[in-house]
């Protein structure tokens, strides 16, 4: 592997966090920082990176590994997270993911009052208004849980801290953050990678794990290709206030030709949404005044597609005219029998954002001394809501492979030890990405023949208990 040099800002004063946590020490540039050795260095402290660190720490076989958790962001600040306005970055957790969090001791630290379980999903075709209902049996486990990503990070981080504080031995996990990697280069012997940083000197590791997202530094260093394509679609997200619920929490998804629109419940009459649409429409929606945007969002769950298509073509620089059209069309549609989300009353100021959507999957998950997981290895459309769950399943599989290697005296950084992880996850993720891609393309079609077949398919699906049970199992337990 060739070395990868990244620009970073050097600091005169270099803070480090002691293993006992909460105690900050400072080393000055004049002091010599010795090269430090790790068994594993995880790059990225999002939910996937933190889950991997927590999982390694709680597994009786892997807890002896010396682990470094490195991130350019100071994720340590989240241990004192103040619970304020809901974040617009949320994830749907399967029961399988929830049980993994419970197994590693993180679920106890999650703020349950900010997590919304739900047992019902209603999905509809935006052209024909045909729909399917997915409902868990009364008394069964929730179908899924909606949570802010920051709540998951808070729970994982505090579970790690709790274990470190209660470990009578010297803790084997070190937080290396905030920390910028300036260079990655090939090491010697079993310490395969040298990591040059701005604040923690030079580190060496047997295994470097990239949990650092779609723009992964680790993936680029390892020269692992990630084939894929852009969807020419942007996802608009935000946090909502809604009319008080009069029944159980329900997730709604409407498949429009411009892209799917999802409404996902949060506690205390809050909700989040993911509105996948064409880039020029997303840009126009972001510029709308908040009041008009809320009307447009309500309308997008209620109006027929020809009405929405007309509205998309309006000049959004004149919100008053858009408001007039929305008010009139919603009034006409008021007595519709369509099942729709509760009325959205406002969008939390500053919560609107948009990002491009892409499908991509790496050719390799592992190389000598390298492993990738989560978004560093695969990106997909959010329409199925399984992005984080597939990342957590990567984490479980990787921990299992490392545990097996340690038990059998193998080198944890060798390709031989890492191949079981690749074999387990690549095909499953590839199938999932392919299904989501085909589903997205199917519902983007406006051909009358295709829409007729879709309507028939949805009708048959809605009447098939076996098909529903299969989908419910996937939603609840992941891929």
UniProtKB/Swiss-Prot annotation:
Entry-linked Pfam families: FAD_binding_3
One Gene Ontology term from the biological process aspect of the record: ubiquinone biosynthetic process
Membrane-protein topology: Peripheral membrane protein
Primary localization: mitochondrion
Its job: FAD-dependent monooxygenase required for two non-consecutive steps during ubiquinone biosynthesis. Required for the C5-ring hydroxylation during ubiquinone biosynthesis by catalyzing the hydroxylation of 4-hydroxy-3-(all-trans-decaprenyl)benzoic acid to 3,4-dihydroxy-5-(all-trans-decaprenyl)benzoic acid. Also acts downstream of COQ4, for the C1-hydroxylation during ubiquinone biosynthesis by catalyzing the hydroxylation of 2-methoxy-6-(all-trans-decaprenyl)phenol to 2-methoxy-6-(all-trans-decaprenyl)benzene-1,4-diol.
Pathways per UniProt: Cofactor biosynthesis; ubiquinone biosynthesis
KW Flavoprotein (keyword) present: yes
Cofactor(s) recorded in Swiss-Prot or TrEMBL: FAD
InterPro entries (alphabetical): FAD-bd (IPR002938), FAD/NAD-bd_sf (IPR036188), Ubi_Hdrlase_CS (IPR018168), UbiH/COQ6 (IPR010971), UbiH/COQ6_monooxygenase (IPR051205), UbQ_mOase_COQ6 (IPR000689)
Keyword ATP-binding: no
Name recorded for this polypeptide: Ubiquinone biosynthesis monooxygenase COQ6, mitochondrial
NCBIfam families attached to this UniProt entry: COQ6 (TIGR01989), Ubi-OHases (TIGR01988)
GO molecular function: 2-methoxy-6-polyprenolphenol 4-hydroxylase activity; 4-hydroxy-3-all-trans-polyprenylbenzoate oxygenase activity; FAD binding; oxidoreductase activity; oxidoreductase activity, acting on paired donors, with incorporation or reduction of molecular oxygen, reduced flavin or flavoprotein as one donor, and incorporation of one atom of oxygen
Subunit structure: Component of a multi-subunit COQ enzyme complex, composed of at least COQ3, COQ4, COQ5, COQ6, COQ7 and COQ9.
Miscellaneous information on this protein: This protein may be expected to contain an N-terminal transit peptide but none has been predicted.
Catalytic activity: 4-hydroxy-3-(all-trans-decaprenyl)benzoate + 2 reduced [2Fe-2S]-[ferredoxin] + O2 + 2 H(+) = 3,4-dihydroxy-5-(all-trans-decaprenyl)benzoate + 2 oxidized [2Fe-2S]-[ferredoxin] + H2O; 2-methoxy-6-(all-trans-decaprenyl)phenol + 2 reduced [2Fe-2S]-[ferredoxin] + O2 + 2 H(+) = 2-methoxy-6-(all-trans-decaprenyl)benzene-1,4-diol + 2 oxidized [2Fe-2S]-[ferredoxin] + H2O
EC number of the protein: 1.14.15.45, 1.14.15.46
Location within or outside the cell: Mitochondrion inner membrane
Keywords recorded for this protein, A-Z: FAD, Flavoprotein, Membrane, Mitochondrion, Mitochondrion inner membrane, Monooxygenase, Oxidoreductase, Ubiquinone biosynthesis
Domain of life of the source: Eukaryota
GO CC annotations on file: extrinsic component of mitochondrial inner membrane; mitochondrion
Gene that this sequence comes from: coq6
Family that this chain belongs to: Belongs to the UbiH/COQ6 family.
